[in-house]
Amino acid sequence: MIIPSLDFIHGKIVRLYQGNYNNKISYKKDIFKQIEKYIYQGATYIHLVDLDGCNNPENRQKSMFNIFSNFKNVSFQVGGGIRSKRDIENLFHAGVSKIVIGTSAILYPNKFKKWLKNYGSKNFVLSVDININTKKENKIAIQGWKKTTEINLDDAIKQFIPYGLKNILCTDISRDGTFSGPNISLYKYLKNKFPNIVLQSSGGINSISDIYNLKKNNVEHVIVGRALLENKFTFLEASKCWLKE
């Protein structure tokens, strides 16, 4: 599936370059109209990232909850600074389909295991955002990508598999918002290492051929943000490519 992605700060659509808050593009696009556009072209699932929530969960935007109440005919997957039971229950109560957890899962794995058990593993997506170091090791970044840990990608994922986790969103930070193409070899590696996961790719999409290559390498879902906002191709074009055998 092609999943359109919208990141926002203060209710405005933005894109960060490699996760850098000081290097962001702001778009003069109304978030409600942009969602309507994607739905009109056939989108049934949308990925939202609350960048204010990443910095401070207390700043989780009311506009996000307005989106959920305005669009009942589409499913939402939401990430950004989700750290507590209250955050999770508020989002599920608002009608969110899946909640994306990154930093909280890495820093507090036992808490995330409990959430998987209590709320159902199918309702969560583990977000593993990686920096590839000079030794070609995939190290997990946290806290809005501001800090890179010594935790390896494999270790981050495998600890949650016994708790039913299947949905994995993996971003190569060096590709995010760059139009440099997705890291196909990374996703091939993940699908070989963890054949039963449902993998979402994110970062670097520049063309329809990127979509084709990801599908060819058994990626289940492709998150596309900047390429759609800047009209590299339309959601409809991407979806048609995805549905081709």
From Swiss-Prot:
A GO-annotated cellular component: cytoplasm
GO BP annotations, alphabetical order: L-histidine biosynthetic process; L-tryptophan biosynthetic process
Active site positions: D7 (proton acceptor), D129 (proton donor)
The keyword rRNA-binding belongs to this UniProt entry's keyword annotation: no
Any one GO MF annotation of this record: 1-(5-phosphoribosyl)-5-[(5-phosphoribosylamino)methylideneamino]imidazole-4-carboxamide isomerase activity
Main location: cytoplasm
Protein name per its UniProtKB record: 1-(5-phosphoribosyl)-5-[(5-phosphoribosylamino)methylideneamino] imidazole-4-carboxamide isomerase
InterPro entries attached to this UniProt entry: Aldolase_TIM (IPR013785), His_biosynth (IPR006062), HisA_bact_arch (IPR006063), Isoase_HisA-like (IPR044524), Isoase_HisA-like_bact (IPR023016), RibuloseP-bd_barrel (IPR011060)
Family named by the database record: Belongs to the HisA/HisF family.
Catalytic activity: 1-(5-phospho-beta-D-ribosyl)-5-[(5-phospho-beta-D-ribosylamino)methylideneamino]imidazole-4-carboxamide = 5-[(5-phospho-1-deoxy-D-ribulos-1-ylimino)methylamino]-1-(5-phospho-beta-D-ribosyl)imidazole-4-carboxamide
